[in-house]
């Protein structure tokens, strides 16, 4: 960081061929990661810390005091806590040898116990270049005035694994705003591939868990083959509808704001939901449709504002 400039750069030193960084939501939870943290320990590390802060009544403590409480050697506890710090559960002040418990630790334990909602949002940035290049490999840049975090090298984002909503940013670029909102251009896939949106300047609102689709280029729908056929994973095999919907404006509600984990589907049925705001059109001037014989100025299908819910299970007949 050049203190005379407004940008803080994150990445790897010159000579690195592949630079990777991971950015996670403070409410991110993965069961596999929870189990991985447990390892061979008798007590889960997060539970051990929670027991300590309950006993002492403080979330800021010295490493040595925690080692005595846990009964493990100091050197082992230092490694133990360093690992948790790298994963964002605690802040480790190596100079003072003190620990401050972070929000993510509490969120993880609430998610595990079923007492709190969670999300699966994370960003993996990978930037690759020649190892001969003598410049820093930049994964992200934070503007300290606007608080915008520009991130490069992000090929895919999972917004909801239960609703199967994924984003594919154009050029791997996104701009993360405050409180996990972010802006990107590219493709959104929802409903296990049934519903695909292409466009620019899409704005994801974290708290309300929806996407403002500012500039939609087109909407591509896919439906199950009839009779129903399934792939090796048990998913229905889909076929794309030949025509796409254009001149669309609207939004995509991924799930209820209090059900970002998607675990309470019975309480909040019908998601994901796409809603169009204004009239839209289907044109038939693609080369794949009778070699563009139908000019869009003469032939089109006019759609009034519409809504499609349950994007993961609609059928051709239902449409």
What residue spans do the PLM features occupy?
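Structural signature for solvent-exposed beta-strand/loop edge elements and short helix-capping sites
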Residues: 1-319
């Amino acid at each position: 960081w050049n203190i005379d400039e407004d940008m803080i750069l994150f990445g790897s030193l010159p000579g690195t061929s592949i630079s990777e960084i991971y950015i996670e939501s403070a409410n991110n939870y993965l069961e596999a990661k929870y189990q991985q943290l447990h390892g061979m320990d008798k007590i889960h590390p997060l539970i051990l810390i929670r027991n300590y802060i309950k006993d002492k009544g403080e979330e800021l403590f010295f490493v040595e005091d925690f080692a005595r409480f846990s009964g493990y050697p100091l050197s082992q506890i230092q490694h133990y806590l360093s690992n948790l710090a790298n994963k964002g559960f605690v802040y480790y002040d190596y100079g003072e040898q003190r620990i401050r418990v972070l929000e993510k630790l509490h969120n993880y334990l609430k998610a595990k116990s079923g007492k709190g909602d969670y999300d699966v949002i994370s960003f993996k940035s990978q930037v690759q270049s020649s190892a001969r290049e003598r410049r820093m490999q930049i994964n992200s840049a934070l503007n300290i005035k606007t608080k915008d975090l520009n991130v490069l090298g992000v090929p895919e984002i999972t917004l909801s694994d239960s609703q199967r909503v994924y984003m594919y940013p154009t050029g791997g670029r996104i701009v993360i705003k405050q409180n996990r909102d972010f802006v990107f251009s590219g493709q959104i896939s929802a409903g296990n591939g049934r519903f695909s949106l292409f466009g620019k300047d899409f704005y994801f609102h974290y708290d309300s868990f929806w996407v403002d689709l500012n500039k939609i280029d087109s909407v591509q729908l896919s439906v199950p083959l009839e009779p129903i056929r399934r792939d090796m994973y048990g998913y229905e095999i889909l076929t794309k509808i030949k025509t796409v919907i254009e001149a669309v404006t609207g939004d995509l509600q991924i799930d209820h704001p209090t059900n970002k984990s998607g675990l309470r589907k019975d309480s909040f049925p019908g998601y994901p939901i796409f809603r169009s705001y204004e009239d839209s059109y289907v044109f038939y001037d693609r080369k794949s449709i009778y070699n563009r014989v139908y000019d869009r100025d003469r032939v089109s299908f006019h759609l009034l504002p519409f809504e499609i819910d349950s994007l993961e299970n609609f059928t051709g007949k239902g449409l």
